[in-house]
Amino acid sequence: MEKKASILMNRYELGRMLGQGTFAKVYHARNLASNQSVAIKVIDKEKVLRVGMIDQIKREISIMRLVRHPNIVQLHEVMASKSKIYFAMEYVRGGELFSRVARGRLKEDAARKYFQQLIGAVDFCHSRGVYHRDLKPENLLVDENGNLKVSDFGLSAFKECQKQDGLLHTTCGTPAYVAPEIINKRGYDGAKADIWSCGVILFVLLAGYLPFHDSNLMEMYRKISKGDVKFPQWFTTDVRRLLSRLLDPNPNIRITVEKLVEHPWFKKGYKPAVMLSQPNESNNLKDVHTAFSADHKDNEGKAKEPASSLKPVSLNAFDIISLSKGFDLSGLFENDKEQKADSRFMTQKPASAIVSKLEQIAETESFKVKKQDGLVKLQGSKEGRKGQLAIDAEIFEVTPSFFVVEVKKSAGDTLEYEKFCNKGLRPSLRDICWDGQSEHPSLAQSSTLTQSSKSISRHAI
C-alpha cells in the first residue's frame, strides 16, 4: 500500500504495518469516528483472482461473521476498492501466543487458562458448523487483559464442505499440528482434527517445544501417525492422561469436547465465556458482495453500499416434490446425529397466519420475536451451552395461496435446537402444514413451475 493513502475510505487512518503474507498485509489503524484501534487486513484482488482464491476469501468473510465469540478475533466490516479488499478487524494488542512460548514454557495454570479459552472458542465454531483446520500458537493472539483470541480463518471449512461420507478431504494445516488422519490422506472429521491440534498446542504451552519434531518431514509424519510422543518429567499425571487422549492417533476414540470439558484438569478454575450477541446473518451476503463487486471507488472514495434486499430463493420441481408430505421430516424433526442446516414445510395458510403462529410459539417458549427483511427471528431468552438459541423462519410465496416456510438455527447449541423443535415447534406447526393428500389446484395449474426452476418471492412481513 502506498504511504500517501493514509486515510482509507474516509473511515480509517492507517498506521504501521503489523505483518504480511503472500496475498495480504495487515496494518494498525484508527477509526476516525470512534477513535477505536483496529487491524486492517489488505488483500490484493488481482493476486486472489489470479490463483483462484475467490471462494476462500468469501468463505473467510462468511465464517468470521458467523463465529462471534469473546475468544475469537471479530470482523467489524468489509470494504473494497477496484484493486483491494479491506477487512476491518478487532485489534489485539498482546500479539501472538507463540512469542510468549518462544521465551519459555508456561506455568500450568497459565497454560490451562489459555487452553480453556481455546477449547471454548473451538467448541463454539463447531456448534456453528465451522472447522478451523489450522490451529497453532501463531494463529492465537493475546489481548491486553491476557485473554486468548483465535485468528486466521483462511483455511477454515464449513460443515457443508463434507462429502457424501460425511468427512472432509482437503489436506491443509501446518505439518507439526496436523492430525494423523489428514496426513494419511483419509477423509477426516473436522472437529476431531481440530481437537488433535488443540492437544499439540497444549503440549507446546506446557513443554516449550513440539511433541512431534524431526528434521526429516517423513519421519515426523511417522511419529504423528503412531502418536509417538514422550512427555517431559515435569508433566503431572493428570496432564499426561489428558494429552494421551487428545493425541490419540485413532480419531474414533480421541477425546471429544463434551468429554474434555468434564476432565478434572480442564475444569479447575474454568469460567465459560459470556457470549456476544449474534449479528444479522444477511451481513454475510452484504460483505461478500462488497468484497467482490467491481463497481467501487478508489481508496480515497467512499465504499459503495450493497443493495439491502436479498436475492429471492429459487425452488425447482425436485424441491417441491420433496415437500409433498408437508414437512421435510429428515432435517428438522428426526433425531439424526447430523442436523440439517435448514428445513422447510408447505402451507396454504396466509403469511399473516404463519407469523401469528410463530409469535404464539415464541410466547409459549419465552422467545423474543423480531420481524425483519422477510424473516421472523425467534431469539431465546435463556443462556444455553453456546449462548442464546436463535431461529430464523423465512416465508416464500409459491402462488398467492401457497407458501413455503424455511426454518433454520442461526445461533446456539444444536442439541438445544433439536429439543426445541421436537417439543415446541413440531407439535405447534402441525395444524398449519399442508397435508399433501389432495393436490393443490393452483400449484397443479402452474406447469412452468413444476417443470423448471423458478424464483419464489419472499413474502413481505
From Swiss-Prot:
Family under the similarity heading: Belongs to the protein kinase superfamily. CAMK Ser/Thr protein kinase family. SNF1 subfamily.
Reaction catalyzed: L-seryl-[protein] + ATP = O-phospho-L-seryl-[protein] + ADP + H(+); L-threonyl-[protein] + ATP = O-phospho-L-threonyl-[protein] + ADP + H(+)
Cofactor(s) required, per the database record: Mn(2+)
Region (Disordered) location: 440-461
Domain NAF: 300-334
Gene Ontology biological-process annotations: signal transduction
Chain segments carrying region PPI: 340-369
Pfam family, one: NAF
PANTHER family the record matches: CALCIUM/CALMODULIN-DEPENDENT PROTEIN KINASE KINASE-RELATED, CBL-INTERACTING PROTEIN KINASE 5
Region (Activation loop): 152-181
UniProt protein name: CBL-interacting protein kinase 5
MF terms (GO), sorted A to Z: ATP binding; protein serine kinase activity; protein serine/threonine kinase activity
Start and end residues of each Protein kinase domain: 12-266
Residues of the active site: D134
UniProt enzyme class: transferase
Functional note: CIPK serine-threonine protein kinases interact with CBL proteins. Binding of a CBL protein to the regulatory NAF domain of CIPK protein lead to the activation of the kinase in a calcium-dependent manner.
